[in-house]
């Protein structure tokens, strides 16, 4: 059985249980059991199957069983539990990294619970001794604490059903004043990964204990992990009512709810990272690379004199950037996105995850702290810059922890003479970021909490996207997420402002289906609002569902606001449905509100052309040209309408102006000008224009002949004999 087949059966089992289709779930389970070749599960499967058959028998033979619901619940959870076990057994055969790490841990901890407990106790004692040495300024220079922490991380992560000694370890770490906060963060991350690896209610409850503790830097990670778990296991939570009370208690705290909402929004934002990276690399970087020769010349970068100050800002930068249309706005937009928490550095740092530091899985989740011994060991003791860099990185709220380590480790291999410049630039950048923040924001403690959540989600994103063995993990950033369909959201988080925030997020990022769903949800929960009808209509329009969009625009129209915008959109939708009469009606309605809008007049004229009312279209375009005489976009339809209406001399004059203009001509400019010359019996000139038309396209004959056939009726109307058109085609083909 392939990896995909195992995953399909396992996921299908969970779906069947959620839908109440337990027989189908049992059949899936039987296939997994057969593949596992583990007979010790056979008895459990037979018991579940018999219990379910008996329950159905009693139910449909008329027996009243007050325990039916409880038995059904027990069978469902048992099916899922067995599916978890079989899935882990089968998956391990296909996952070499997890398999090797499990074997390594067994060699360290063994399998005897007493031995494992003893090793855990030893770890906790070492933490206390290490803290004591730090308090008395005694340094061992030993790597053992970090290695021990890596082992504890993997022990928690690879644990399936949590045991008493695991629970004791996690709680003692949470409560201990001797375990540093970065290591507590690692335990939280290991616990989160462990839940994704194997569902266990006790693990979820342990995460909530870290949240209740409210230790700065730690609880935000636990909260984020908990929310990702709730998203991932939403359909399964209903089978575990023991979670409801603890979660309700937890999210009664308004501050915590606000932080949870931020984490949800940041999670949605992180799913945009690939798009942001692609946009930056395709739209901004190429333009900046093209600018480099001009920057070097204009700023005389090769002539740095002794008197130059590296901190002086050169006004030429802004001038050069302005030379590239739209570049400054793009850079400004990406800077704003960065300040708002968007992940704009993924592409930059993705190639800097190859340091040995990132070999242990735990280090992908390690918070950046400037006292980390790993950092100091990477630099010579006499290096004057690294402490300034570490201090700056620790304060840099806009860079995630994983990227901070990449930055610092890469800095260590940069030539010493360049380090000063980089540190100075980095400190200036950090200072500028602080300047963007208001005084109130700097004093707002919630911002610190927010930055922890944002950075942690970006750390998680890097792990799931860049870790060498990432394919052995379920990527929590993949798959469809619709809060409207999630029971945990309805139970613990549902409130109108957040629904609106999620809807706006999807709308702004052009996720039309999700936006439509969330605005529909908002509509169900609130009073009728014109802006909701408008946004739903616009989403439907962008999805190509024009008739539905019209229905919603008409409902928005009843509120008597934004009439110009609504009429314009209705006209556009009717155009797409090719109902040009209705389109004209709405565009004219909009024109009454904004009579001087040339765009509206152009749309009305376009509808007249589509309705073959060329005289009406020509009148409008002629009026528009009076105000914009040099606009070829207006002259083109004027020339074509004149040709169709038989005003050949005027059409010839118009096409002569179009072809003389330095603006790039289209295939149709040459073709239509050729039509006019042909009808005026200027055949040689006409064929030259037709040749230029053919030369302007990649695959010449099909689109050219198709357009020629469409226009043949106007050629016939203007005196060309029907037999002449096929001769014209053959003549042109001989020319190439």
PLM features: what roles do these ranges have?
Residues 1-8, 15-16, 100-120, 136-143, ...:
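TPR-adjacent "capping" and linker segments in tetratricopeptide-repeat scaffold/adaptor proteins
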Residues 369-560:
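Alpha-solenoid helical-repeat scaffolds
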Residues 498, 531-532, 566, 600, ...:
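TPR alpha-solenoid repeat register
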């Amino acid at each position: 059985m392939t990896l995909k087949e195992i995953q399909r059966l396992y996921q299908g089992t969970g779906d069947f249980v959620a839908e109440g289709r337990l027989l189908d779930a049992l059949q899936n389970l039987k296939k997994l059991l057969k593949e596992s070749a583990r007979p010790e599960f056979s008895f459990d499967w037979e018991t579940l199957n018999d219990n379910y058959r008996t329950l159905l028998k009693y139910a449909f033979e008329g027996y009243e069983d007050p325990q039916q619901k409880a038995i059904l619940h027990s069978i469902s959870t048992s099916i899922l539990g067995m599916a978890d076990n079989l899935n882990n057994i089968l998956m391990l055969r296909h996952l070499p990294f997890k398999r090797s790490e499990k074997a390594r841990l067994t060699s360290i901890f063994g399998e005897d619970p007493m031995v494992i407990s003893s090793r855990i106790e030893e770890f906790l004692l070492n933490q206390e001794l290490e803290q004591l040495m730090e308090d008395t300024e005694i340094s061992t220079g030993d790597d053992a604490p970090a290695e021990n922490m890596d082992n504890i991380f993997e022990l928690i992560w690879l644990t399936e059903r949590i045991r008493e000694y695991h629970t004791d370890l996690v709680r003692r770490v949470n409560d201990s004043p001797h375990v540093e906060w970065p290591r507590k963060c690692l335990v939280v991350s290991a616990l989160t990964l462990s839940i994704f690896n194997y569902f266990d209610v006790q693990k979820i409850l342990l995460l909530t204990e870290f949240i209740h503790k409210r230790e700065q830097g730690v609880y935000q990670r636990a909260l984020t992990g908990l929310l990702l778990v709730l998203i991932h296991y939403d359909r399964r939570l209903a089978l575990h009512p023991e979670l409801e009370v603890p979660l309700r208690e937890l999210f009664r705290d308004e501050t915590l709810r606000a932080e949870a909402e931020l984490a949800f929004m940041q999670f949605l934002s992180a799913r945009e990272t690939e798009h942001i990276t692609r946009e930056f690399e395709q739209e901004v970087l190429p333009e900046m690379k093209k600018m480099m020769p001009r920057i070097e010349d204009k700023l005389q970068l090769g002539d740095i004199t002794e008197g130059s100050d590296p901190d002086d800002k050169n006004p030429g930068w802004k001038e050069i950037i302005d030379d590239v249309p739209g570049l400054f706005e793009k850079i400004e937009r990406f800077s704003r996105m960065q300040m708002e928490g968007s992940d704009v550095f993924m592409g930059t740092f993705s190639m800097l995850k190859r340091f040995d530091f990132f070999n242990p899985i735990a280090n992908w989740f390690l918070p950046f702290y400037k006292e980390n011994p790993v950092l100091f060991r990477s630099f010579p003791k006499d290096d004057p810059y690294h402490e300034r860099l570490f201090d700056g990185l620790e304060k840099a709220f806009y860079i995630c922890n994983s990227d901070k380590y990449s930055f610092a480790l890469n800095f260590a291999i940069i030539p010493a003479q360049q380090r000063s410049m980089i540190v100075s630039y980095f400190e200036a950048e950090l200072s500028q970021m602080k300047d963007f923040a208001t005084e109130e924001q700097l004093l707002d403690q919630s911002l610190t909490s927010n930055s922890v959540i944002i950075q942690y989600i970006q750390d998680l994103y890097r792990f799931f996207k860049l870790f060498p063995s990432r394919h052995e993990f379920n990527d929590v950033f993949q798959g469809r997420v619709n809060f409207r369909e999630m029971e945990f959201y309805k139970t613990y988080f549902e409130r109108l402002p957040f629904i609106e925030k999620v809807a706006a997020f999807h709308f702004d990022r052009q996720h039309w289906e999700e936006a439509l769903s969330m605005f529909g949800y908002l509509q169900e929960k609130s009073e009728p609002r014109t802006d909701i009808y408008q946004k739903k209509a616009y989403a439907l329009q962008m999805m190509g569902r024009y008739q539905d969009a019209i229905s919603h625009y008409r409902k928005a129209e009843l509120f008597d606001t934004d009439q110009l915008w609504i009429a314009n959109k209705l006209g556009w939708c009717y155009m797409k449905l090719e109902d040009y009469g209705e389109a004209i009606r709405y565009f004219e309605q909009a024109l009454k509100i904004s009579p001087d809008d040339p765009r509206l007049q152009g749309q009305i004229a376009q509808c007249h052309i589509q309705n073959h009312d060329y005289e009406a279209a020509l009148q409008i375009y002629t009026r528009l040209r009076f105000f914009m005489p040099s606009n070829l976009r207006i002259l083109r339809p004027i020339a074509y309408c004149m040709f169709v209406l038989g005003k050949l001399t005027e059409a010839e004059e118009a096409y002569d102006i179009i072809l003389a203009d330095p603006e790039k001509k289209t295939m149709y400019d040459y073709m239509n000008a050729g039509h006019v010359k042909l009808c005026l019996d200027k055949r040689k000139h006409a064929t030259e224009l037709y040749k230029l038309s053919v030369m302007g396209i990649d695959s010449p004959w099909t689109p050219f002949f198709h357009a020629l056939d469409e226009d043949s009726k106007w050629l016939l109307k203007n005196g060309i004999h029907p037999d002449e058109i096929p001769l014209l085609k053959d003549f042109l083909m001989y020319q190439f």
